Amino acid sequence: MNRLPSSASALACSAHALNLIEKRTLNHEEMKALNREVIDYFKEHVNPGFLEYRKSVTAGGDYGAVEWQAGSLNTLVDTQGQEFIDCLGGFGIFNVGHRNPVVVSAVQNQLAKQPLHSQELLDPLRAMLAKTLAALTPGKLKYSFFCNSGTESVEAALKLAKAYQSPRGKFTFIATSGAFHGKSLGALSATAKSTFRRPFMPLLPGFRHVPFGNIDAMSMAFSEGKKTGDEIAAVILEPIQGEGGVILPPQGYLTEVRKLCDEFGALMILDEVQTGMGRTGKMFACEHENVQPDILCLAKALGGGVMPIGATIATEEVFSVLFDNPFLHTTTFGGNPLACAAALATINVLLEQNLPAQAEQKGDTLLDGFRQLAREYPNLVHDARGKGMLIAIEFVDNETGYRFASEMFRQRVLVAGTLNNAKTIRIEPPLTLTIELCEQVLKSARNALAAMQVSVEEV
């Protein structure tokens, strides 16, 4: 039987939500009721499958940790008042911390003036953000297209490369095994995990994947394309594969890829959606090798954890294919004043507080500690690796990795696995995480591994 729409029900539900938004605190009964509602609504209206992947939901589904507010720059508080150290960072969006006051203030001030742009009058913050990114990014990157997410920034990059290279008779893209570039149809064609790809086959033609970090395989793909007339339009890469398990290529790999692109007339697209904005100890990970891409993709932390925003930045030569018809690729909400205000404030905080350098220093502290734990628990931990505050702990199997994440949750530390490598747990906290909290995270990790070791020995 078809369900009839109910304006009364929708009105009551929205009014209830607005009442919750206004509240600063909840009493015990309100907390219990909200937990039940959220779990029920996820089951019935969002996706019940999500609950199976949440460490914060008990097996019986009778309790779930429902987030309520940021506790500080580096912590989250649930409806029960429990405070968690955030070592997940919303998959890398909270580089400047939770509710950073500079970012929040910028958005609030803009909200009081003009939340969204008219689409006809020129919006100043879009222009100022584009100018700021031109100054901040490496090489000849000059023009920016703004959107709402990392996937959208990759879609724009692929379309831009196609528009530039199609008149030159080049149509093929090289991506890499283990890559993650998003899940929309174009970005998914570059993504390499079969679980995400197979239900939507066939994807866009013209994509081939080579092993990440293997410059010989990359060179062969270029050479074969030249021989067969299937010439390469662009290479799309993450400088460090995030969802692939925080996989670092050999030193000099990006430099050699850049040389191949120059030799064969291909564009180099760097997807820094996760590695950008100071995460790896430099503002952009490509700066570790002084490599300059033709197109750069940003998102996640660009909005300061307050507003969603993505950016595709390109050289004038490449971006000029959109000059005659700027409507070839547009988005209604991309580059809106609130998002641009957040991005400008985020960049200001990153530079004023020198957070990339802090990420390098504190990342070394964390990585040294995790490597020590790997030596102490070799039957549980296979490897610890990373750069800056993008760190991975690889366990011996998927179940051990999931158990570690659950134990860390009990220690009130949020971590999670990577999408393409389930046995790898990422440590991706705000760059504002204090040294004291870094030490607490390492202590919690030691406690978690000790508890896991006891379970292994009992078996």
Swiss-Prot record:
Q: Which UniProt keywords apply?
A: Aminotransferase, Pyridoxal phosphate, Transferase
State whether keyword Transferase applies.
yes
GO MF, one term, reads:
diamine transaminase activity
Pathway field of the UniProt record reads: Amine and polyamine degradation; putrescine degradation; 4-aminobutanal from putrescine (transaminase route): step 1/1
Q: Which CDD domains match?
A: OAT_like (cd00610)
Q: Which InterPro entries match?
A: Aminotrans_3, Aminotrans_3_PPA_site, Class-III_PLP-dep_AT, Putrescine_aminotransferase, PyrdxlP-dep_Trfase, PyrdxlP-dep_Trfase_major, PyrdxlP-dep_Trfase_small
The cross-references to Gene3D superfamilies, in alphabetical order and at most eight, read:
Aspartate Aminotransferase, domain 1, Type I PLP-dependent aspartate aminotransferase-like (Major domain)
Keyword field contains RNA-binding:
no
Q: GO:BP terms for this protein? A: L-lysine catabolic process; putrescine catabolic process
Which of the residues bear the PTM N6-(pyridoxal phosphate)lysine?
K300
Record SUPFAM superfamilies: PLP-dependent transferases
Residue numbers binding pyridoxal 5'-phosphate = G150, T151, Q274, T332
Q: Which Pfam families match?
A: Aminotran_3
Q: Which cofactor does it need?
A: pyridoxal 5'-phosphate
Enzyme class label: transferase
Q: Where does the UniProt annotation place the signal sequence?
A: none
Q: What is its EC number?
A: 2.6.1.82, 2.6.1.29
User: What reaction does this catalyse?
Assistant: an alkane-alpha,omega-diamine + 2-oxoglutarate = an omega-aminoaldehyde + L-glutamate; putrescine + 2-oxoglutarate = 1-pyrroline + L-glutamate + H2O; cadaverine + 2-oxoglutarate = 5-aminopentanal + L-glutamate
Q: Which family does it belong to?
A: Belongs to the class-III pyridoxal-phosphate-dependent aminotransferase family. Putrescine aminotransferase subfamily.
The free-text function statement in the UniProt record for this protein reads: Catalyzes the aminotransferase reaction from putrescine to 2-oxoglutarate, leading to glutamate and 4-aminobutanal, which spontaneously cyclizes to form 1-pyrroline. This is the first step in one of two pathways for putrescine degradation, where putrescine is converted into 4-aminobutanoate (gamma-aminobutyrate or GABA) via 4-aminobutanal. Also functions as a cadaverine transaminase in a a L-lysine degradation pathway to succinate that proceeds via cadaverine, glutarate and L-2-hydroxyglutarate.
Identification of the protein by name:
Putrescine aminotransferase
Question: Source gene?
Answer: patA
